[in-house]
Amino acid sequence: MTAAVRSRPSLRFRGRSFHAMVLAPEVPVAAWFTDLDEWIQRSPGFFQGRPVVLDVSNLSLSRSALADLLQEFSARGIRIMGLEGADLSGHDLQMPPVLRGGRRENVIDLFAGEEAQASGKINSQIQEGDAHDVESAGALLIETPVRSGQSIMHLEGDVIVVGSVASGAEIIAGGSIHIYGALRGRAIAGAQGRKARIFCRKFEAELLSIDGYYMTADTVEPHLLGRPVQVWLEGDRLMVSIQD
């Protein structure tokens, strides 16, 4: 005798890996936060809506000190989704989970040293889990303008924008960035190497960065504004030339 059994959709658990920004504070922590505040002033929306992992392996913190540190980030609108390098015994629902097995993908140094003038380095990392498998290292083509508040991240290659990038928007690329319109937002290229370049048809950028070295709008020569330019890294300085 054959019995009919009602079939149900299977319950499946699937793994996913996602890119996340990793911040690694260094001592003295107060000075580190001062640098972070300066970065946020230059790029107010940089951390908005972006998950961040906090690496505390460089610090020796008690549980209460770690809670105070997390509060500092919360006060700045930075959402900490996980901890790395923390030794938390027991389970604390008020703490982000401790993450292990992350693979460093690249380093972007956020903070300029005292000797830097037009460019500097920032101390943060973009990290992905070991399970992430890049099928092909190709370019990402964006055929519409990038609006204010949008953030495009493509760490596997170049990013090509057919339109413009508005003020308050940002493009983060593992390779080069090509913008066939006005660049009024932030362009962060070279997450996977210093040979990357940034090209745009109309240069009005809030911030430029290649391999972690950056320049802000207040350091740009006035004669470059509104012109088609190419940006590249030479030594530890960003170079900008007009492309007529």
UniProtKB/Swiss-Prot annotation:
Transmembrane segments annotated in the record for this chain: none
Originating species: Beijerinckia indica subsp. indica (strain ATCC 9039 / DSM 1715 / NCIMB 8712)
InterPro entries xref list: CAP/MinC_C, MinC, MinC_C_sf, MinC_N, Septum_form_inhib_MinC_C
Domain of life: Bacteria
Protein name per UniProt: Probable septum site-determining protein MinC
Subunit structure: Interacts with MinD and FtsZ.
UniProt keyword annotations, A-Z: Cell cycle, Cell division, Septation
Biological process, per Gene Ontology: cell morphogenesis; division septum assembly; regulation of cell division; regulation of cell septum assembly
Family: Belongs to the MinC family.
NCBIfam families found in the cross-reference section: minC (TIGR01222)
Function of the protein: Cell division inhibitor that blocks the formation of polar Z ring septums. Rapidly oscillates between the poles of the cell to destabilize FtsZ filaments that have formed before they mature into polar Z rings. Prevents FtsZ polymerization.
